[in-house]
Amino acid sequence: MTKIAVLGGGSWGTALANVAAENNNDVRLWTRTATQADEINSQHTNQKYLPDAKLSSELMATSNMALAVMDAEIVLTVVPTKVVREVARQLADVLNKQDHQVILAHATKGLEQVTYKRVSEMLAEEVPAKYRSTLAMISGPSHAEDVIKHDLTSVSIASENEEAAKLLQQVFANSSFRPYTNHDLLGSELAAALKNIIAIGSGALIGLGYGANAQAALLTRGLSEMRALGQAMGAQPETFLGLAGIGDLIVTGMSPNSRNYRAGKQLGEGKSLQEIQDDMGMVIEGVSTTKAVYEFSQHHHVEMPITAGIYRILYENEPLRDVISDLMSRPLRSED
């Protein structure tokens, strides 16, 4: 039995905590509010984020981070990108009061605004130095709504520390949840963030009434952009052809369970971004990631026309059909 603290009681944090608890691990889920923790402990539900799902009775929740992290061998943060530093600073305060080593992992798919930093970089800057050597990420095609129903799911666990990746693999693996390990943390984090941008575009095409041909073309050329930026930043190109790359892109860019896809679809149907964000009530990571990646690509001269087009839609209020027209009329070129 492994002691695991999961920080973040949203849909994905809850689903991952539930997988680990069902695998007979000692799991404590940290939530923002005592009300949410009480619901999970007494009713074994998390209705706000996973309506009608029944959670393991072995999963314990608390709004006290110190209690959640106490004696944990693994600490997994699963919070929106915009609050990673805030949560990491709270975690650092807790870790500073204990002296045993922990594996620090995350399952957040985004980049920090302005700095363009990946989640592992933010965590490394905030937590004590001795915890940085085990940083890892869980990513891949894994909607929480499917995981909680025990639909067959495979994920990627990326870490430069092979021992940490293998322990995470062991505690989460079961008959419906199969983790693979890889050592390209940089590429996995970039792929996880970048595919959210392309998913918004994919949903927008469907919302406008376009069909599978258009969607497949956008996903394929979007993958090319993801890979180009990844290589420019030092990632391994093959990572983008694995679960963390094309796997996550397919499910995020085509599934109605994807917030980014749904946001794009509603944009295509004529809703404003503000209306969509108000209605959804949950973070749409691709919106902020689009801005960060667009600015980064401009600064480093990486050509990303689809990302630039989605930026114009989200931040410059350019009509979707005008952006599509521009993309389709770009100078002809080879596919390479």
From Swiss-Prot:
GO terms for biological process: carbohydrate metabolic process; glycerol-3-phosphate biosynthetic process; glycerol-3-phosphate catabolic process; glycerophospholipid metabolic process; phospholipid biosynthetic process. InterPro entries: 6-PGluconate_DH-like_C_sf (IPR008927), 6PGD_dom2 (IPR013328), G3P_DH_NAD-dep (IPR006168), G3P_DH_NAD-dep_C (IPR006109), G3P_DH_NAD-dep_N (IPR011128), NAD(P)-bd_dom_sf (IPR036291). Keywords: Cytoplasm, Lipid biosynthesis, Lipid metabolism, NAD, NADP, Nucleotide-binding, Oxidoreductase, Phospholipid biosynthesis, Phospholipid metabolism. One of its GO terms (cellular component) is cytosol. One of its GO terms (molecular function) is glycerol-3-phosphate dehydrogenase [NAD(P)+] activity. Pathway: Membrane lipid metabolism; glycerophospholipid metabolism. It is an enzyme of class 1 (oxidoreductase). Pfam families: NAD_Gly3P_dh_C, NAD_Gly3P_dh_N. NADPH binds at S11, W12, R32, K109, A144, R259, V283, E285. Its EC number is 1.1.1.94. It is found in: Cytoplasm. Its main location: cytoplasm. Disulfide bonds: none annotated. PROSITE patterns: NAD_G3PDH. The active site is at K195. Sn-glycerol 3-phosphate binds at K109, G140, S142, K195, D248, S258, R259, N260. It catalyses: sn-glycerol 3-phosphate + NAD(+) = dihydroxyacetone phosphate + NADH + H(+); sn-glycerol 3-phosphate + NADP(+) = dihydroxyacetone phosphate + NADPH + H(+). HAMAP family: NAD_Glyc3P_dehydrog. Catalyzes the reduction of the glycolytic intermediate dihydroxyacetone phosphate (DHAP) to sn-glycerol 3-phosphate (G3P), the key precursor for phospholipid synthesis. Belongs to the NAD-dependent glycerol-3-phosphate dehydrogenase family. This is Glycerol-3-phosphate dehydrogenase [NAD(P)+].
